[in-house]
Amino acid sequence: MARLDYDALNATLRYLMFSVFSVSPGALGDQRDAIIDDASTFFKQQEERGVVVRGLYDVAGLRADADFMVWTHAERVEALQATYADFRRTTTLGRACTPVWSGVGLHRPAEFNKSHIPAFLAGEEPGAYICVYPFVRSYEWYLLPDEERRRMLAEHGMAARGYKDVRANTVPAFALGDYEWILAFEAPELDRIVDLMRELRATDARRHTRAETPFFTGPRVPVEQLVHSLP
């Protein structure tokens, strides 16, 4: 991979939206080819408004209340809102969906390590599996001395050193919803995310996590596979 221009990437404003939906059983009927064509065309057209569809993810069964998740990102949050609204209003798939959860984050430079760039922004290919969750730090976290927070974050990073195949996308979400951060882990295999998450529990920074649910996890799937799998 070419050397990254960290200054340019950290100067980039990029909003991310993770939107989770459920579908009522039978709402899509049995004949789904037209639904697939409609949804495929819609997602491809989003590039014209500057929206990148990073992936569609099957979260069915990993949660009882949701069937799939869509990850989009763009320079302007209004573009993401338009994609979200148009999907629900203009596509057969979207009209059959009920929103379960949606969260927005914005890339900003990491506080202590400016080379910590989200995988999607660094130009990395999407992972085969994803785990997305929001989190909120303790009230004390932001009042701690910089060196103490730096130490804990460095320890947190060291705990992940054996999982270089698990790529992190950590973005602030202050004022964009009910959370302070949104994190999306991407990996070639799901067990790698599971093992990493367990490792990260044994770090001091864990003491300063006040909330970190809900979790949305599953494989990245093409539109055709997703639509055929829906109830």
From Swiss-Prot:
Fe-coproporphyrin III acts as both a substrate and a redox cofactor. Was originally thought to use heme as a cofactor. Its EC number is 1.3.98.5. GO terms for biological process: heme B biosynthetic process. Pfam families: Chlor_dismutase. There is a cross-link at residue 44 (Isoglutamyl lysine isopeptide (Lys-Gln) (interchain with Q-Cter in protein Pup)). GO terms for cellular component: plasma membrane. The gene is chdC. It comes from the Bacteria. Fe-coproporphyrin III binds at residue 156. It comes from Mycobacterium tuberculosis (strain ATCC 25618 / H37Rv). It is an enzyme of class 1 (oxidoreductase). This is Coproheme decarboxylase. Belongs to the ChdC family. Type 2 subfamily. Involved in coproporphyrin-dependent heme b biosynthesis. Catalyzes the decarboxylation of Fe-coproporphyrin III (coproheme) to heme b (protoheme IX), the last step of the pathway. The reaction occurs in a stepwise manner with a three-propionate intermediate. Its cofactor is Fe-coproporphyrin III.
